[in-house]
């Protein structure tokens, strides 16, 4: 059986933006992935004290953003899970759901890579997947040797990219909408229309 190479891009996607799509495309092309699965979070444990948009809206925006990319798809497994969302649990679920020979490539930013040794079941994460870490503009390159000391085996699992450097964030999109500014250059047109139609991120 031929192995499938599947990229995993998780996030709150509140909202999904062009930077997410650029990252997914870059990693897919560079590593020769067969597909990329977008996984919106349910209630992420690291944002438990913050208000995020309803899961249905975040899921719908991802569906709209990737609708013209046959090699992108979305799964709602974290949204359906009750309680906090943990990456290790999601990777274990994917190992059960996806074909047996599937190789997982989990995408994250350099900032999240720095924090990885403190994540829930971090050792299990690096056992279940390859890590693909990409920068955002202005971020300092992680000290991989130091991270490997904190989490042995991380370096062997890691693919450290120097690009794409994306200077877009969901918080920027939300802020611009709240201030009545356009976001058509930051999110796909269908997502911009959805935000407007459903009055997301507007001042209450």
Curated annotation (Swiss-Prot):
Pfam name, any one: CTP_transf_like
Top-level division of the source organism's lineage: Bacteria
Known pathway: Cofactor biosynthesis; NAD(+) biosynthesis; deamido-NAD(+) from nicotinate D-ribonucleotide: step 1/1
Catalytic activity: nicotinate beta-D-ribonucleotide + ATP + H(+) = deamido-NAD(+) + diphosphate
UniProtKB keywords: ATP-binding, NAD, Nucleotide-binding, Nucleotidyltransferase, Pyridine nucleotide biosynthesis, Transferase
SUPFAM superfamilies: Nucleotidylyl transferase (SSF52374)
GO BP terms: NAD biosynthetic process
InterPro entries: Cyt_trans-like, NadD/NMNAT, Rossmann-like_a/b/a_fold
Tagged with keyword Nucleotide-binding: yes
Molecular function, one GO term: ATP binding
Documented EC number(s): 2.7.7.18
NCBIfam families documented for this protein: cyt_tran_rel, nicotinate (nicotinamide) nucleotide adenylyltransferase, PRK00071.1-3
Task performed by this protein: Catalyzes the reversible adenylation of nicotinate mononucleotide (NaMN) to nicotinic acid adenine dinucleotide (NaAD).
Family of this protein: Belongs to the NadD family.
Protein name, UniProt field: Probable nicotinate-nucleotide adenylyltransferase
Organism: Dehalococcoides mccartyi (strain ATCC BAA-2100 / JCM 16839 / KCTC 5957 / BAV1)
């Amino acid at each position: 059986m031929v192995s499938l190479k599947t990229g995993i891009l998780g996030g709150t996607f509140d909202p999904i933006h062009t930077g997410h799509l650029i990252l997914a495309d870059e990693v897919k092309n560079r590593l020769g992935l067969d597909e990329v699965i977008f996984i919106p979070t349910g209630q992420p444990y690291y944002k438990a004290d913050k208000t995020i948009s309803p899961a249905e809206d975040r899921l719908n925006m991802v569906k709209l953003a990737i609708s013209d990319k046959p090699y992108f798809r979305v799964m709602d497994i974290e949204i359906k899970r009750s309680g906090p969302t943990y990456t290790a649990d999601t990777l274990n679920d994917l190992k059960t759901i996806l074909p047996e020979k599937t190789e997982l490539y989990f995408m994250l930013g350099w900032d999240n890579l720095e924090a990885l040794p403190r994540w829930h079941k971090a050792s299990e994460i690096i056992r279940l997947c390859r890590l693909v870490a990409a920068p955002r503009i202005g971020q300092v390159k992680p000290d991989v040797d130091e991270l490997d000391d904190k989490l042995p085996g991380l370096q062997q699992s890691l693919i450290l990219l120097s690009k794409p450097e994306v200077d877009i964030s969901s918080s920027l999109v939300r802020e611009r909408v709240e201030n009545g500014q356009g976001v058509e250059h930051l999110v796909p047109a269908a997502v911009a229309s959805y935000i407007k139609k459903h009055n997301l991120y507007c001042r209450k």
